[in-house]
Amino acid sequence: MSTRAQEILLPPQSNIMRVVFLYVAQGDATLFFIPSGGRHLTMLIDSNQGRKHGGINLVELLQDLFEGQANGSLTYYVNTHPHLDHAGGLDEIQDAIEIDNVWHSGHDPGRNHCEAYDALQRLRKKVTDKGGEDRTLTGTRSTELLGEAVYNVLSPAQHVQDEIADEDPEVRYRRIHEHCAVLRIGYGAPVPAFVLITGDSDKCAWQEHITEYHGAGDENRIWSQILSASHHGSRTFFKTSEDDPEPYTRHMDLIKPENLIISAPLQEESCHGHPHDDALELYKKYISEDAIFHTGDGRRSFICDIYSDGRFFINDDGGELAEHYGFPPDDEDGGGGKEERSKSTGPYVISQIDRKPMG
């Protein structure tokens, strides 16, 4: 009998790249299923154990996802930067499932901000001890292959890594979002559909290091149909502060996104007020309101299926994953009820946002 995670998450065909933006409350976790020779590579970009506001318990979900599967391990864990809302629960995850390879930004935040960083170091050692890949992501002009997908590492640039590494710990920590990994992953031919994963990358990162270098030359490597909103819909993608008189939007001119995914709880539930109203207004200048998808709205996870010809659909799970795997309101320590919840109890039908191809 399949688990609910398998029913909802596993792609129905081997020639579909599936991208799942999971509801993890105040944090990020994006799961990729990447076609590769008749099977799928799996990649989890960032993680958060959103115990408040019913976030999905990633440990239970991932255990159920890989239970009884021939490919019973996570092929890649990718960390855009070592903040707890992007590397939360990492010790629990690596104890619960096998992780073959790890990619990361190479940021060392210093001893006063080391909890997520230390968990990442433990994973790096565990992976390398088994002969897996431990890769520090560095921005490059190259387009690389991953299974049957293509990808670009857009950030951090080598000179940014070197410069920030020479700073004292507190300055390094303040610049962590400038040092954030940014990746674009695409699938389909002749023109791939691209998903742009931005982590918490900020105005400085885009204005000073990413946009012109990767977007304004002969090849636009930031153009993407699906944009994951940076920093949970924070204004920091556009502004240095709320009263910044010169919001930066050049990156949006070149990304040209058709769809936006915001990973955050409801604004009134967010400890930072995400997504920020002024950021939403800027996004709406480029993206129609009905193509802006917010995980906090109904505690939904959004599922993007990209086909081999580049067409794609974005659907949602109707909040089913959060209902089935979400932390209960009184859960303080991340316990859960996997034994009571993990098995499927009936057929599952995904909610269609729009049955017409979106790309």
What label would you give each PLM region?
Residues P109, E219-I303:
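Long, structured stretches of catalytic cores involved in phosphate-ester chemistry, encompassing
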Residues D28-A29, K52, H86, R111, ...:
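Flexible loop/turn segments at secondary-structure boundaries
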Residues P35, R39-M43, N48-H104, G215-R235, ...:
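Active-site metal-binding motif and surrounding structural segment of the metallo-beta-lactamase
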Residues V24, I45-G50, P82, H107, ...:
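Active-site metal-binding loops of divalent metal-dependent hydrolases
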Residues S2-V19, V24, D64, Q69-Y76, ...:
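Flexible, acidic/histidine-containing loops and adjacent segments that form or flank the divalent-metal
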